[in-house]
Amino acid sequence: MLEEMTYKEEFIEFMVRSGVLTFGDFTTKSGRKTPYFINTGNYKTGYQASKLGQFYAACLHDNLGDQVDALFGPAYKGIPLAVSCSIALYEQYGQDVNYCFNRKEAKDHGEGGTMVGYKLQDGDRVAIIEDVITAGTAIRECLPVLQGAAKVDIRALVISVDRMEKGTGDKSAIQEVKEQYGIDAYPIVTVREIISYLHGREIDGKVYIDDEMKARMEAYLEEYGIGPAGGRIGVGCAGRRGPLFLLSHRKERPSH
């Protein structure tokens, strides 16, 4: 019998098939030359939105269980993530979790305000749902919005990929968020898990991380990365296996 995939493994293949995770020669906004790139703007179909919500829900459920009252999606990329995650939490785990998001500009007519969706209450346990984090900027912008709405307990930040890179100092953005705001960040996968899983593995007949690419990625992390090498998938509850997450080598979109 074939071994079931973890949702982490599924998510890595999902990113590759969706054209979100690519390999080659790229330059980051900070000017770093990187051998891989993650472009979450390439998610664009209903199927992808549905699957993405399931991966976020799996990560959230594994790390926080049912200890969340509301999901907050920072405008703009966080909005569909929070909505799709809340749907998946209900469909997969029976958790009917509230969701809300902010407007970039306050509305001065109708109901007004900067918040849309669930009205946060004092004591609510909130998880922020975001695509990636490369600096603490997004969190710094979120905190006044959330704390201005109610006296909430921000339990976690859930993101798709932890690049495990240093920022301007010696810490990663995730480490800085924990240190400055006391907020735990949970990635669906880390870049080291991506390397471990994809190295020498064919996805639809193509090997994306061969020995040369692995060496380039490890050299990049040696220069800009944080934390130890390694990162095998499947350690602890965050890598649990289960039929709920099986893709069975499904393509990007289901056939009709």
Positions of PLM-derived features:
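PRPP-associated nucleotide enzymes
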Residues: 1-129, 134-256
